[in-house]
Amino acid sequence: MRLEEDVKLDYKDVLIRPKRSTLKSRSQVSLERRTKFRNYEPPFSHNVEDYHYNGVPIMASNMDGVGTMEMADKLAEGKIFTCLVKTYTAEQLIQYFDSDMPERTDNVAMSIGTSDEDWCKLEIVHQIVTEKLKYVCMDIANGYSDHFAAHVRK
C-alpha cells in the first residue's frame, strides 16, 4: 500500500460562483451537454464528431432494478444515459442493441466485469452489433487495482 501525504482539497475548499445568465426564462434552459472523449478514436471510418456524447450528463447505474432495458429505453427518450446490469445474456444484449433505435446506441452502455466470461460476452455482442454498441461500462469494486488497469488495456 502507498501512503499519500500531500495536501488534498475538499468540498469546503471550493467556491462555485455562478455566471450571469443570458436566458430570460427557465424554459430556455437545456440540460444537454456535449462531451468529447480526449483519448477516443472511433474504430470505424465514420465522422469523429458522431462519437462524442451528446445528452444530459446524468447516468442511471447498472444496479438491479435500475439498469434495466425498460428503464434505459424510457430514460433515452430524454437523452439520459443508462448502464445496463451485467446479468443480461449475450443473446438478450444482441437483440436489444441490434435494433433500429439510435437512442439505444447513443444513451445505453453494456456492463461487464473483469472475468474472462464477461470479456467473451463483450466480444460476442460487439462482433454482431458492431457500431450499435458504442459504450461499455466496466463495473469493478476497486478501480485503482492493477487487475482493473490490465483489463482496460485489453
Predicted regions located by residue number:
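Active-site entrance/lid segments in N-terminal catalytic domains of soluble metabolic enzymes
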Residues: 1-154
